[in-house]
């Protein structure tokens, strides 16, 4: 099935709010094996919304709108959809009941009540995180317009609870979707290795890159879940076999989730010393459930004095080699492990930019070290062509640190080579 997304909100056009809704919906459609044709963004203007809606209905089987379902005058998505589809708004009794339950004994303003009015013939989607229900409105035979609230905290539960099951039923098939996640190979190299697998129609195999990682989604359709999984799993195994040990998991949330689980399984602890990443690595670890079992100390040692006082980095080493050096990265990893009683220590120091670089130590140069009781490993991240920004450099460095620890605990070589312009050891 073909789908289009229409994101509604002037704040999106002005850049005041990042359009994460389209990303969430796009990922959900991809997981269902649907083809996303276009994403439109329109302001709070009924005429422009109507034009975008009519254009989308000429091409797509499913049109999904996000935003514009609230109680204010500029929330006009339902009214516009009702007009375009010829489905007048009607009070939806169950939505009204839920709205009254939400407000309890508090008075409900008249404009709040309009949220319980839905286009005639709609299938309502309850909003367990807010007041505005979503709905699916039938268009011509086999066509639907799905209306979702704008706040991600409301949209995401509705997607999971109501929209995805609805679309699965409408598609007449059960979808099995697997995400193979990798770090250490570029999209081009990966695509060459799995080129023949991407030619299949069921399952489909689609590689794409994000945040210096490369993902491969395998999606199969069948009459039931068991049959869909049986179609997909041999292809997932083939992808893993072709890509090798750069694969760090299937249907996992990220490198940090894998590392925390490895630490828990091995009953090992981690301490971290960061300079240029400013606590990002520690944040990624502590975002994971169960992190407190394996992670006790995370230090941001920006200043040389902090590196010496808190980690034991020798002053003469800093004076001789500078804070951004392999020697200091190693000392940070060893110092944080030894001083704070952990099994593993990670140290990161570099020039995240955009300023501060020199000819000898350019912007983007980062040293990442991993220490255990009997060894220290180092990766050097050197700038590869165009500087991609401070956040990119910090994210990449933290991912390298996680990957080094992941590989060590899996019994793989830590100082691996890199392809497609990723940093070289």
Swiss-Prot record:
By its UniProt entry, which SMART domains does this protein fall under? Answer: MoCF_biosynth
SUPFAM superfamilies according to UniProt: CinA-like, Molybdenum cofactor biosynthesis proteins
Please give the superkingdom of this protein's source. Answer: Bacteria
> Which family would the database say this protein is a member of?
Belongs to the CinA family.
The record's section on NCBIfam families has: cinA_nterm (TIGR00200), PncC_domain (TIGR00199), PRK00549.1 (NF001813)
Q: What is this protein called?
A: CinA-like protein
């Amino acid at each position: 099935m073909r789908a289009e997304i229409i994101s509604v909100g002037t704040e999106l056009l002005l850049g005041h709010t990042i359009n994460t809704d389209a990303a969430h919906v796009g990922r959900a459609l991809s997981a269902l094996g649907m083809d996303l044709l276009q994403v439109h963004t329109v302001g709070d203007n009924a005429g422009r919304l109507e034009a975008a809606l009519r254009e989308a209905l000429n091409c797509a089987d499913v049109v999904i709108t996000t935003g514009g379902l609230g109680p204010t005058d500029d929330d006009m998505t339902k009214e516009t959809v009702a007009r375009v589809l010829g489905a007048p708004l009607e009070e939806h009794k169950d939505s009204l009941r839920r709205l009254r339950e939400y407000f309890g004994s508090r008075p409900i303003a008249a404009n709040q009540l309009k949220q319980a009015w839905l286009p005639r013939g709609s299938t309502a989607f309850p909003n367990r995180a807010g007041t505005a229900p979503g709905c699916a409105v039938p268009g011509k035979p086999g066509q639907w317009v799905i209306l979702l609230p704008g706040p991600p905290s409301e949209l995401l539960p509705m997607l999971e609870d109501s929209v995805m099951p609805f679309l699965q039923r409408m598609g007449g098939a059960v979808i099995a979707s697997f995400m193979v996640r990798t770090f250490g190979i570029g999209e081009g190299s990966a695509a060459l290795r799995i080129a023949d697998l991407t030619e299949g129609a069921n399952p489909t195999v689609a590689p794409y890159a994000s945040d210096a990682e490369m993902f491969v989604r395998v999606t199969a359709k069948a009459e039931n879940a068991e049959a869909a999984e049986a179609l997909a799993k041999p292809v997932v195994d083939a992808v893993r076999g072709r890509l090798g040990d750069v694969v760090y998991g299937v249907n996992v949330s990220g490198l940090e989730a894998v590392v925390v689980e490895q630490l828990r399984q091995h009953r090992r602890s981690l301490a971290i010393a960061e300079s240029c990443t400013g606590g990002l690595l520690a944040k990624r670890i502590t975002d994971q459930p169960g992190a407190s079992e394996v992670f006790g100390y995370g230090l941001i040692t920006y200043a040389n004095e902090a590196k010496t006082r808190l980690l034991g980095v020798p002053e003469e080493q800093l004076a001789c080699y500078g804070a951004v050096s392999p020697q200091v990265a190693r000392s940070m990893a060893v110092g944080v492990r030894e001083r704070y009683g952990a099994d593993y220590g990670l140290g990161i120091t570099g020039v995240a930019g955009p300023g501060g670089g020199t000819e000898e130590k350019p912007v983007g140069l980062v040293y990442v070290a991993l220490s255990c009781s009997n060894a220290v490993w180092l990766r050097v991240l050197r700038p590869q062509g165009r500087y991609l920004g401070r956040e990119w450099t910090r994210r990449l460095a933290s991912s390298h640190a996680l990957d080094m620890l992941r590989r060590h605990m899996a019994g793989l070589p830590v100082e691996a080579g890199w392809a497609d312009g990723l940093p070289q050891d």
